[in-house]
């Protein structure tokens, strides 16, 4: 969805098993976006697939990193001798975030803390997700070229509120006196 927003020197990590999916078959793309993207790909002589979108990002100077998320889960399931893990596609988000942190060389401790916090009442689920996170993080640090970016850790100041975009918008509207949002 955000391929056109990736800047030069940007980074794309994507699931290689999705390369041949047509834009029209991506269920998370709304119809207007599909039409725009299909036209954009056609005007740039690219395939009407995820592969075409990734090629455009690459041509604009983005660093492209392809990995099969399913293969990562399969390798992890073999390593942990837990065949159930290889079919847990809901772990793809954890894999994606962990691959990103590994590529950017951002310490993974905060991710581990977050996963343990989110699944604090489900210890076995937390352990599986932490294993997946560490596995993907280590994969990225071993397999992806160092991109040369350095991030410094910042302390979160007291009274700092971290919210997702739609929460921030809602809070802003309430503070501004808006009484109805549709």
PLM regions with names:
Residues 1-180:
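Active-site cofactor/cluster-binding pocket
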């Amino acid at each position: 969805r955000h391929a056109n927003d990736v800047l030069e020197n940007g980074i794309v990590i994507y699931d290689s098993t999705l390369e041949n999916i047509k834009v029209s078959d991506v269920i998370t793309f709304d119809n207007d976006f599909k039409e725009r993207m299909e036209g954009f790909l056609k005007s740039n002589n690219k395939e009407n697939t995820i592969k075409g979108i990734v090629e455009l990002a690459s041509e604009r100077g983005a660093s492209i990193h392809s990995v099969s998320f399913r293969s990562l889960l399969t390798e992890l399931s073999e390593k942990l001798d837990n065949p159930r893990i290889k079919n847990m596609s809901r772990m793809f988000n954890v894999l994606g975030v962990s691959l990103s942190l590994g590529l950017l060389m951002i310490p993974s401790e905060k991710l581990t803390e977050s996963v343990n916090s989110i699944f604090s009442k489900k210890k076995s689920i937390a352990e599986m997700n932490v294993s997946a996170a560490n596995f993907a993080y280590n994969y990225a640090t071993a397999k992806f070229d160092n991109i040369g970016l350095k991030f410094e850790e910042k302390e979160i100041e007291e009274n700092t509120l971290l919210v997702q975009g739609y929460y921030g918008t809602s809070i802003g509207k309430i503070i501004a006196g808006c009484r109805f949002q549709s």
